[in-house]
């Protein structure tokens, strides 16, 4: 702490990102990255943009990512004016906190959810309330039907992996016409229904996507928001008051090419889903209680061992999973669905540790 810090910095509790181990060959199952490489078309697009000399890199990128937004809009069957592009979905969410979620009534989100939400709320001084999940970690829809303030939650939820059906999401959006409802769909491609189809009917709905998970582009930092043009304009006003050029040239062309390669997207998405079900079965056989998952990770509780101890023991073997020292979930592990070889290495290590 320094005497030069502002009051708000003194009060912050920063988000703690997942560990990025500096090892040659870790089994990295702690940050929900895709185990498969990006679309070959994305790699080709990067090479074309660079050319032989990298001449393009001396020029600023398109500040509004027009071609990318047009491609993504066409993919979802909406207008480009209904698409916002930002530097990762975390930045998109940050802009939403500033542009849309600061009101007299508190913002509401689940008590067990993406831990960046309370961090952003404190940073931007947004009053908030947490709404308890049910005992099975599902969102209780009736708790959000009172039009009592803005609503934010991931679907599927993180770190639990549980998803609400689209009909329940529509109930929440319809019941809150006076406030913005933000659905964070970082993991939607692995088993949930997207709410993008609802934005034409609900001007209060904002849906956030990322290319970090299903499209294997976490290193490019690209995220989107979809919603009524007035909501998108609000995000753009914040963006242009903060950073007019959030997406570099390589990120724009790689992401556009990724959306143009549907065959690759579907093949890798289905492989992750198949590997997830395989991992769920293996963990259950080892005595874990596994929460039903519609994401690219599983949330599991070892019945006979301490979760934090297991995570530490796995780390000693260069296998990384995520443990949260938080109420209600401190005996759970969040495990990314890796390649089958990575999942097999995890299961083999757990089998040895649980038998010791």
Curated annotation (Swiss-Prot):
UniProt pathway: Amino-acid biosynthesis; L-histidine biosynthesis; L-histidine from 5-phospho-alpha-D-ribose 1-diphosphate: step 7/9
Statement: the UniProt record of this protein carries the keyword Transmembrane helix: no
GO molecular function: histidinol-phosphate transaminase activity; pyridoxal phosphate binding
Cofactor or coenzyme needed: pyridoxal 5'-phosphate
Domain of life: Bacteria
Record key words, sorted: Amino-acid biosynthesis, Aminotransferase, Histidine biosynthesis, Pyridoxal phosphate, Transferase
Pfam families referenced in this protein's UniProt entry, alphabetically: Aminotran_1_2
Enzyme Commission number(s) from the entry: 2.6.1.9
Catalytic reaction equation(s): L-histidinol phosphate + 2-oxoglutarate = 3-(imidazol-4-yl)-2-oxopropyl phosphate + L-glutamate
Sequence positions bearing N6-(pyridoxal phosphate)lysine: 213
GO biological process assignments: L-histidine biosynthetic process
Membrane spanning stretches: none
InterPro entries listed in its UniProt record: Aminotrans_II_pyridoxalP_BS, Aminotransferase_I/II_large, HisP_aminotrans, PyrdxlP-dep_Trfase, PyrdxlP-dep_Trfase_major, PyrdxlP-dep_Trfase_small
Keyword Transferase appears in the UniProt entry: yes
Catalytic class of the enzyme: transferase
Family stated for the protein in its record: Belongs to the class-II pyridoxal-phosphate-dependent aminotransferase family. Histidinol-phosphate aminotransferase subfamily.
Quaternary organization: Homodimer.
Protein name: Histidinol-phosphate aminotransferase 1
Origin species: Burkholderia pseudomallei (strain K96243)
Gene (name only): hisC1
């Amino acid at each position: 702490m320094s005497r030069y810090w502002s009051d708000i910095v003194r009060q912050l509790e920063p988000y703690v990102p997942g560990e990025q181990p500096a090892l040659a060959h870790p089994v990295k199952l702690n940050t929900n990255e895709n185990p498969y490489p990006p679309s070959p078309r994305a790699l080709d697009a990067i090479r074309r943009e660079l050319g032989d000399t990298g001449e393009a890199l001396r020029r600023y990128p398109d500040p509004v990512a027009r071609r990318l937004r047009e491609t993504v809009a066409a993919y979802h069957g909406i207008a480009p004016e209904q698409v916002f592009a930002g530097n990762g979905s975390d930045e998109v969410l940050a802009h939403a906190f500033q542009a849309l979620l600061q009101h007299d009534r508190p913002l509401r989100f689940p008590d067990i959810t993406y831990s960046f939400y309370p961090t952003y709320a404190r940073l931007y001084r947004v009053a908030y309330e947490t709404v308890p999940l049910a005992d099975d970690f599902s969102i209780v829809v009736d708790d959000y039907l009172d039009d009592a303030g803005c609503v934010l939650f991931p679907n599927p939820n993180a770190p639990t992996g549980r998803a609400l059906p689209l009909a329940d999401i529509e109930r929440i959006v319809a019941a809150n016409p006076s406030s913005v409802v933000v659905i964070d769909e970082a993991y939607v491609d692995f088993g949930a229904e997207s709410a993008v189809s609802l934005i034409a009917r609900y001007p209060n709905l904002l849906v956030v996507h990322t290319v970090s998970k299903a499209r294997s582009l976490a290193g490019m930092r690209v995220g989107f928001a979809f919603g009524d043009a007035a909501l998108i304009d609000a995000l753009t006003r914040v963006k242009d008051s903060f950073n007019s050029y959030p997406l570099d040239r390589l990120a724009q062309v790689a992401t556009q090419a990724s959306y143009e390669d549907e065959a690759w997207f579907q093949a890798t998405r289905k492989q992750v889903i198949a590997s997830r079900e395989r991992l769920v079965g293996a963990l259950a056989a080892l005595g874990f209680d596994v929460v039903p998952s519609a994401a690219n990770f599983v949330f599991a509780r070892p019945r006979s061992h301490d979760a934090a101890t297991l995570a530490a023991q796995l780390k000693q073997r260069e296998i990384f999973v995520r443990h949260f020292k938080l109420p209600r979930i401190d005996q759970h592990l969040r495990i990314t669905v890796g390649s089958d070889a990575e999942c097999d290495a995890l299961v083999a290590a757990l089998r040895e540790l649980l038998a010791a």
